[in-house]
Amino acid sequence: MTQATPQRIAIAGASGRMGQMLIEAVLDTEGVELAVALDRAGSPSIGQDAGAALGRPCGVTITDQLDALAQADCLIDFTRPEGTLQHLQACLRHDVKMVIGTTGFDSSGRAEIEVAAQKIAIVFAPNMSVGVNATLKLLDMAARILNSGYDVEIFEAHHRNKVDAPSGTALIMGETVASAWDVALPDVATWTRHGDTGVRKPGTIGFSVVRGGDIVGDHTVFFCGTGERIEISHRSSSRATYAQGAVRAARFLARQDNGLYDMQAVLGL
């Protein structure tokens, strides 16, 4: 692909809310073009123009044929773990780079992505928002300073249809704090509380979750000390910020060889 040639982008889950946001972001970004729009087999969107629902017909027909990825340079995927892993295998077959914003992978799914990154370039991040990734840098700084005498609690809220909890963003926030403390998150996490929980154990990281309505995504990390409390928050009002970040990640991959990258690498943080 020469510099003058647009990067050919494929979108998975093309008829969904996030898929439509991604399509719009691609159509609005110079240097990229929508080449492939994928959806699940049996979807009523199959055969329709990918931009029609946006009022922006683009000449790309939604398909369920994964071999259509041969026409793309990079796939952006915000679907479900099982679907993303199927798409990953198709990307390996056709040497297509991949931006993965899907959350909820188990350890074997994450391992599969790591192995695939030895052959293709992948950006794998639970949150593509530039603001969230700036927030992670602030969290790292705060956790290194507030490493003694402060209790950490992570609160997150999302819409009623989100199926994994805590969110991938909340988990990476917890991992950021744990890493700054030189501990592993599973060793210090408190996932739920109910009944007589006893006194809070020092050095633990608590999580609390809300699911309801159409909340796009709220995250707050509390550093609770004696006589003071520091709160670092990020609130999303639109999925557009995730879509814009994902397209930015795809542009980053155009310059990369095989390897596994996160949004910190994309943003140069």
Curated annotation (Swiss-Prot):
Q: Could you say which residues bind (S)-2,3,4,5-tetrahydrodipicolinate here?
A: H159, G168, T169
Q: Which residues bind NAD(+)?
A: G13, A14, S15, G16, R17, M18, D39, G101, T102, T103, A125, P126, N127, M128
What is the reaction catalyzed?
A: (S)-2,3,4,5-tetrahydrodipicolinate + NAD(+) + H2O = (2S,4S)-4-hydroxy-2,3,4,5-tetrahydrodipicolinate + NADH + H(+); (S)-2,3,4,5-tetrahydrodipicolinate + NADP(+) + H2O = (2S,4S)-4-hydroxy-2,3,4,5-tetrahydrodipicolinate + NADPH + H(+)
Instruction: Report the locations given in the UniProt record.
Output: Cytoplasm
GO BP terms, alphabetized: diaminopimelate biosynthetic process; lysine biosynthetic process via diaminopimelate
Q: Which UniProt keywords apply?
A: Amino-acid biosynthesis, Cytoplasm, Diaminopimelate biosynthesis, Lysine biosynthesis, NAD, NADP, Oxidoreductase
Q: Which SUPFAM superfamilies match?
A: Glyceraldehyde-3-phosphate dehydrogenase-like, C-terminal domain, NAD(P)-binding Rossmann-fold domains
Q: Name one GO molecular function term.
A: NAD binding
Active site, per annotation:
H158 (proton donor/acceptor), K162 (proton donor)
* Principal cellular location given in the protein's record: cytoplasm
The EC number(s) attached to this protein equal: 1.17.1.8
Q: Does the keyword Disulfide bond apply?
A: no
Task: Tell me the residue numbers annotated for binding NADP(+).
Answer: R40
Record Gene3D superfamilies: Dihydrodipicolinate Reductase, domain 2 (3.30.360.10), NAD(P)-binding Rossmann-like Domain (3.40.50.720)
Question: What top-tier enzyme class does this entry carry?
Answer: oxidoreductase
Which pathway does it operate in? Amino-acid biosynthesis; L-lysine biosynthesis via DAP pathway; (S)-tetrahydrodipicolinate from L-aspartate: step 4/4
CC terms in the record's Gene Ontology section:
cytosol
| Biological role | Catalyzes the conversion of 4-hydroxy-tetrahydrodipicolinate (HTPA) to tetrahydrodipicolinate.
Q: Which family does it belong to?
A: Belongs to the DapB family.
What is the official name of this protein in its record? 4-hydroxy-tetrahydrodipicolinate reductase
Point out the gene that encodes the protein: dapB
